[in-house]
């Protein structure tokens, strides 16, 4: 992989301005000691989403047991135990924010016997009990390919089950050394074949993959029962992370979208700043 590129192209320059509900969203999250992937993963869309009064809740703390080389989330072999109040605090925040579509995600917790699956279950149940009309999108980890743990979450029947394959097979060992491409695809397949869930996945580009490799991964997703996909530009969080190989042009993102739709993926979002949960409500089953 090449060294990090010195200058971002114009299409990757954001005008940052906090307005609207930004301050209220930040205060609400801080008061309830809630983590968001928006902040922990250094998402470029944080100000836009928080200003619209939306956020993606990060379960099981903000310390991950894995060291994926693209991710800004902090790591440790044994993070603090999960906050038992988190499910109710998230449910309360959803109610106060008056959300219609809620995105939940989590760090990997390989230190826990069930990978945090029961905590996921409690959170989903708490959110629905307090907000019966809300739709849930769950962006889940792989639970170390433990079917029993995975099924605890799938059995709660979220309206959208999201699991990102993240990248193509040829660089998986570099990007996600503690994960497995086939295992991630099989999560999508199990959610579809055994639970008939609406499924979603995501890819980052600009890490050394080729156009044809991305197209093949889109084929793989379709063959494993994926309904929706997001494709976005990888941005290096720090000097210790994988360097950006190239900046993918908006035109190439449009090509990915065209290919994905031609393969039968019914909801596709493809662009430089696209992230898994960005404008997730517009990719929900009702849209």
UniProtKB/Swiss-Prot annotation:
Cellular component aspect of the GO annotation: cytoplasm
GO MF entry, a single one: metal ion binding
The keyword Transferase is assigned to this record: yes
SUPFAM superfamilies assigned: Radical SAM enzymes
UniProt-annotated location(s): Cytoplasm
Requisite cofactors: [4Fe-4S] cluster
Enzyme class: transferase
Protein keywords: 4Fe-4S, Cytoplasm, Iron, Iron-sulfur, Metal-binding, S-adenosyl-L-methionine, Transferase
UniProt xrefs under Pfam families: Radical_SAM
S-adenosyl-L-methionine keyword on record: yes
Residues annotated to bind [4Fe-4S] cluster 1: 38, 43, 49, 277
Domain Radical SAM core: 50-266
Main location: cytoplasm
Catalytic activity: [[Fe-S] cluster scaffold protein carrying a second [4Fe-4S](2+) cluster] + N(6)-octanoyl-L-lysyl-[protein] + 2 oxidized [2Fe-2S]-[ferredoxin] + 2 S-adenosyl-L-methionine + 4 H(+) = [[Fe-S] cluster scaffold protein] + N(6)-[(R)-dihydrolipoyl]-L-lysyl-[protein] + 4 Fe(3+) + 2 hydrogen sulfide + 2 5'-deoxyadenosine + 2 L-methionine + 2 reduced [2Fe-2S]-[ferredoxin]
Family matches, as PANTHER family: LIPOYL SYNTHASE, LIPOYL SYNTHASE, MITOCHONDRIAL
Family: Belongs to the radical SAM superfamily. Lipoyl synthase family.
Name used for this protein in its record: Lipoyl synthase
Organism: Chlorobium phaeobacteroides (strain DSM 266 / SMG 266 / 2430)
Source lineage: Bacteria, Pseudomonadati, Chlorobiota, Chlorobiia, Chlorobiales
